[in-house]
Amino acid sequence: MRRVWLALLAFLGVACITAAIAIPAFLVPQLRVVPLDLDITSVASTVPADGSAGERFPAVIFDRCSVSQPKARTLDAHLTQQRRSVIIEPSDKRQATLQSAQTVQIDRIRDADGKETDPPAPRADGDLKCDDGLLTATIDRVSVNRKTSVPNGTVSALQLEAAPEGVNVKDVSVQLPDRKGFQYKFGFNVKKRSYLYYDLNTRQDQPAKYVGEKTFNGVKTYEFVSEVPETDLSSLPNAQGEACLLYTSDAADE
């Protein structure tokens, strides 16, 4: 009986060692995929190009109320971007489709005379005016390979306007078939090298260059910088395939 117990204990010991080795080898590849319960909310504010803090008006935006005037104007502004990304269908063991709803809110503006204004919140009826605080609102949908996080082309579309009841979302969306770069999530096992980054505003893939390491809240991170070239956004097509022009003759006092 003693031999049996020793043999049993020896077997269990080997089994435990085997399990200790096999489980991580099995679990790690399974865990290194885009999770299907992904739900991320982020908030970011504009900062000057040099990254310094304290500037009240670090951005410059087009004065939409000047579109019908003889001369277009710009405004100094402070902006806040809010984004929520979740997983939607089609998603399975090979791919995950991310839906990212994003708004850019104008917190405050300053005109050429130095007058500061807090723009009004969007109106309840959804009718946008040229002086509204809502600058942009979009819903982006993109399918990615769960192992690499690279877009696979199954779904790649940008919704630019609300879809009324009975209207297919595709009818108010722009298809983005050539998207290749990372966007909402980097891949796994990131190296100190350049990667493609997809800039949704200009709808272009741009290189994101590794520039060094930074520590945030005690966590060591890699910093990547992407320089997006100046782009005429008015030439980008809308859902109807036409060049975008958000405002025509709206005035602030209408």
Stretches found by the model and what they are:
Residues Y247-D253:
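Conserved small/polar residues in nucleotide/adenosyl-binding loops
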Residues R2-L158:
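Solvent-exposed N-terminal domain segments of exported/luminal and surface proteins
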Residues S85, Q95, N145-L246:
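Extended beta-strand-rich segments in extracellular/periplasmic secretory proteins, especially
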